[in-house]
Structures are given as structure tokens and as C-alpha cells.
A protein has these predicted regions:
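Bacterial Sec-dependent N-terminal signal peptides
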Residues: 1-22
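C-terminal, helix-dominated tail/subdomain
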Residues: 471-497
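Substrate-binding groove/exosite segments of carbohydrate-active enzymes
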Residues: 47-51, 59, 281-443
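Beta-sandwich/jelly-roll carbohydrate-recognition scaffolds of carbohydrate-active enzymes
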Residues: 21-304
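Conserved functional hotspot residues or short segments at active or partner-binding sites
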Residues: 448
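Short, surface-exposed recognition loops and adjoining beta-strand edges that mediate ligand/DNA contacts
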Residues: 328-343, 460-477
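Conserved small/polar residues in nucleotide/adenosyl-binding loops
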Residues: 498-504
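An active-site-proximal structural segment forming one wall of the substrate-binding cleft
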Residues: 451, 455-458
Length: 504
């Protein structure tokens, strides 16, 4: 146990140990007090509900007649020949239930409840036109997003009314300059999305100039549908209203990082989910999240702070299980097409998502972060050579996950050397809390060693004062000078690197 800001943190190997503890017992429904509950629909996308499985996810929000999802995936990075590496959205799904089921003017009752414990969202509404229920979750074990829709329509059904499920991708500029600059060519980032159908599925295929391609597949179960091609970039499934409407929507997303044939694999994911049955899929989904929550328990005297702790843990479990680290600037939760400020990752901000994960026994969520930076060792070593050292590596503050050192020549960052050592610190925390010596030896230590070697080669000896010093250097975003001596940030990180023992 550690006392951290009045928090009692107790780590256990599994839930059985918790229940057997003589200290206290945790109610099976303890986490329900941290459910996110709306008693009226939220039409602003940025106030929607986050759902994800660590790789696939996005926000869900309301329209007067249904719901909208922006579908995102952690590895959809476009790498154009001339331009920055940019994380693209996959697309959007719109579900229109045919009547104003969420209109403020017509609501008699409403509740939307995001269960952190089960990683699912349940929505209920009642209007003079219909009583509706929607349940949505992203399978923890496969890239399949499930939306279960039910509607009991009242009195006379509106003539010609239909349920419409639409899949689209329009794309956009990323506006990565944080309002200070923007690409005036609004066609950049649109991609070449095309929709088609294969049997009863809508297939949306996208390919970017940098080589990324991906597929979204959408299937509706339990009700007959007609597929209508709206445009090159949008298709809809239409089903006439009946007094009692029940159907399930399945969405899968596969990228060229996952498969050489994303379309075939996306369809295969839906086939496997259907054969397994959604009941069995959901049981395994709940089992994964039960295990996730059982790995640690936190109680805080301040309920509001405890809410923040658990929603943050939920968000990391929902977004840090893919190929790359969670982007600090929106994660999987962006909603405005491809708009994402600071498109280039800044480590100063990225690291904050990973602070404390090892302590709370979520070391597995550190793996995308660790392995992304280990893959950047060759580029890091090349940059250190340019800075004049024989050995070692450097990671610039602003970079992309392909290893492009974006800020290598920025005046306010050019002699900031600390990101690699900060990365090393988080890597060391993984080992400290797992004691995985093989992973330390084969993955973590090679990076840490090179980060330490840079300082060993770069430090200079002062014959007069009989001490080492570092020059030129600068702290983060130091606009005034890149030629400072003995910056405190470097001194601190040097101490950290050289007090971490090496594997035997």
C-alpha cells in the first residue's frame, strides 16, 4: 500500500484475493457509483460518451431522431510524402430512428448511462412517438462495435417512415497548427473513400497517398434492410418502421497495419462475431473488463477525485491497447472529422497519459508507448550522431511515431535533450512493477542504455572546477536561448538514468 495524496491504493493479483482479504470486502457493484449518467440528451459531440477497446473506439452523441458515432482507430496514421504524419478518423455512423425520440420538446423520460465497469452505454427514452432502448459497446477482444437498437412505436406509425443506418467518410484538414496556422487547401486530408456493398454489408474503403488503407464494414442483424448508395462516400441501410423494431448493428474496422486485405478481414470479423453469437461475445467482453478492474482498487476520501481517477483509468483501458500510444490531443475521442490540434505528438504532453499506470497495476497499457519508442531507436541514434556524439540516442520533443524528429531544428527545442530519458523513466516503471527481466533485457534496456550513452558522450569536463557540465542546452520551449549551461532538467534526468540498475 502507498499513501499518495490521501489515496489508499491496494494492488492485488486477482479479484479473489480482494474478496478473501480480512481488511475489507469490495462490493461487486462498487464501480456503479462512477457511472456517467445523463438525464437529458447531449447534442454537442464533445460531450458525448467514449467507448473503445484500446484500438477501436470513438464518441457517441445524440441527434433529435437518433445517434451519431465518430469511428476512430489508434493506427490510422497517414504518412504523406510531403506533410506531417496525421491520425485520420475512420468515418461516421448515423442511426435515424424515424421519429424525434430525443427531441427536448417531446421527451417524457430519458436516461443515458455509461457503465465504466462493463464498458457499455445504455440509453432509454420515452416520447409520444416511441419508447426506445439502445445499448452500445466495443468488444474488448475484437475490433467489432455493437449497437443494439429497440423501439416500440406508439399509435399510428408515420406514413413512409423508416429507420436509416448511414455509414460515411468525408475527412477534413487536421488544423494541426493550433490556430496559429492552417493549410488553406481544404481538399487536403479528404482521402479517396469509396462505399460499395458485399452481400448485405456496407463496405467503406479508404486509401491515402502515404500508403495507409483501411476498411469499415457494417452489417445489420435481425431485420431486413435495403442498401441505398447515397454518394461515393456514403451508403445507407433502410428498414421500414414496424410497431416493434429490433435490430443489431455491427461495425468492424481493419487497417493495412492489421492485414494485407483489410476488406476481407473486416468482413471476417463480422462473420466470426455472428457465428459466435453476440451473447457469447458480450460474455467474453464483460470477462475482460472484470479482470481489468480486478487488478487494482482505489478509494479516495473525495468522491469527485475518485470519479476522475476511475474515468481516467477507463479511458486508458479503452484507448491504449493498439499499435501506437494514445495521442494526447484527443485520444480516440475526437469528433470533428480529422480536426486534431497539434497533429504532431509532443512528448511533454504524451507522457502525462502514461504517468501512474504502472503504479495502478496497468502495466500492459504501457506496452504501446514503450514499443513505439523502441522502434524509433535507429532514428534516435542518427540524431545523436548529428549532434556530435559517437554513441547514444536522442528523441526530439516534437516528433511523429514513424521516427521523424520534427523539432530537431526548432530554435526553442533544438538543444532540449531530455525526452529520451523521460521515456526511459516510464519504461523503467514497467519493469519495476512487473519484474519482467526478459522484457527489460530485450526491449527496455537497449533504449535506456542508448539514452544514457548520449549524456556520457555529450558531457564535458571542467578542469578548473573538476566537474562535468552540459553545454549547450535548454529546457522545454525555451524561446530565449538554446545555449544554456547545466540546465536543471538535464541534471535531473542524468541522475535518474545513472541510478537505474542494469539487468544481469
Amino acid at each position: 500500500m502507498k499513501n499518495i495524496v490521501s489515496a489508499l491504493i491496494v494492488l492485488f493479483c486477482n479479484v479473489c484475493v480482494i474478496q478473501a482479504s480480512s481488511l475489507f470486502k469490495i462490493d461487486d457493484n462498487y464501480l456503479s457509483q462512477h457511472d456517467i449518467v445523463y438525464l437529458e440528451p447531449e447534442f454537442d459531440s464533445f460531450n458525448g460518451f467514449p467507448l473503445g477497446n484500446g484500438d477501436l473506439g470513438g464518441m457517441l452523441w445524440f441527434t433529435n431522431e437518433g445517434i451519431t458515432l465518430q469511428i476512430n482507430k489508434i493506427d490510422l496514421y497517414d504518412k504523406p510524402a510531403n506533410g506531417r504524419m496525421t491520425l485520420r478518423s475512420a468515418g461516421r455512423l448515423n442511426v435515424n430512428l424515424g421519429v424525434p425520440c430525443y427531441s427536448y420538446m417531446h421527451l417524457a423520460d430519458f436516461e443515458a448511462r455509461l457503465s465504466l465497469q462493463n464498458a457499455d452505454l445504455k440509453i432509454k427514452s420515452s416520447t409520444p412517438f416511441a419508447d426506445t432502448e439502445i445499448t452500445s459497446w466495443v468488444d474488448a477482444n475484437s475490433n467489432v462495435w455493437v449497437i443494439d437498437c429497440q423501439a416500440d412505436y406508439k399509435k399510428t406509425l408515420p406514413s413512409g417512415a423508416v429507420n436509416r443506418i448511414s455509414l460515411e467518410r468525408w475527412g477534413s484538414c487536421d488544423f494541426g497548427g493550433w490556430y496559429g496556422s492552417r493549410d488553406r487547401d481544404v481538399a487536403n486530408g479528404l482521402g479517396t473513400a469509396k462505399v460499395n456493398r458485399q452481400e448485405n454489408d456496407i463496405i467503406l474503403e479508404e486509401k491515402f497517398e502515404g500508403g495507409l488503407h483501411f476498411t469499415i464494414a457494417c452489417r445489420v442483424l435481425k431485420t431486413p434492410t435495403e442498401i441505398l448508395r447515397v454518394s461515393d462516400r456514403e451508403s445507407s441501410m433502410i428498414t421500414p418502421l414496424s410497431s416493434k423494431q429490433k435490430y443489431k448493428i455491427l461495425i468492424s474496422v481493419v487497417s493495412s497495419n492489421d492485414s494485407d486485405n483489410p476488406t476481407q478481414e473486416a468482413i471476417s470479423l463480422l462473420d466470426k462475431a455472428e457465428v459466435k453469437t453476440l451473447t457469447a461475445l458480450r460474455k467474453e467482453h464483460l470477462s475482460w473488463w472484470t479482470h481489468f478492474w480486478s487488478k487494482s482498487f482505489v478509494h479516495l476520501a473525495d468522491n469527485y477525485l475518485e470519479n476522475i481517477y476511475y474515468i481516467r483509468r477507463y479511458l486508458m483501458g479503452s484507448s491504449s491497447r493498439g499499435k501506437y500510444p494514445v495521442p494526447f490531443n484527443g485520444g480516440l475521442w475526437t469528433t470533428n472529422y480529422d480536426h486534431r490540434q497539434w497533429a504532431t505528438p509532443h512528448h511533454w504532453n504524451t507522457q502525462e497519459s502514461y504517468w501512474g499506470l504502472a503504479v495502478q497495476n496497468d502495466c500492459d497499457l504501457l506496452r504501446p508507448y514503450i514499443e513505439t519508442y523502441v522502434n524509433m531507436i535507429p532514428q534516435g541514434k542518427a540524431l545523436a550522431r548529428k549532434k556530435g556524439t559517437k554513441d547514444g540516442l536522442l528523441i526530439t520533443e516534437a516528433h511523429d511515431f514513424s521516427g521523424n524528429m520534427v523539432s530537431a531544428n526548432w530554435g526553442n527545442m533544438t538543444t532540449n535533450y531530455t525526452p529520451a530519458s523521460q521515456i526511459s523513466k516510464i519504461m523503467w516503471e514497467y519493469y519495476a512493477y512487473t519484474q519482467d527481466r526478459d522484457y527489460l533485457r530485450n526491449t527496455i534496456y537497449p533504449f535506456m542504455k542508448e539514452a544514457a550513452e548520449f549524456y556520457l558522450n555529450f558531457l564535458q569536463w571542467d578542469d578548473v572546477r573538476k566537474e562535468f557540465y552540459i553545454y549547450p542546452a535548454q529546457p522545454y520551449e525555451h524561446e530565449w536561448s538554446s545555449k544554456l549551461k547545466n540546465t536543471i532538467t538535464d541534471r535531473y534526468m542524468i541522475c535518474l538514468l545513472y541510478t537505474s540498475p542494469s539487468p544481469r
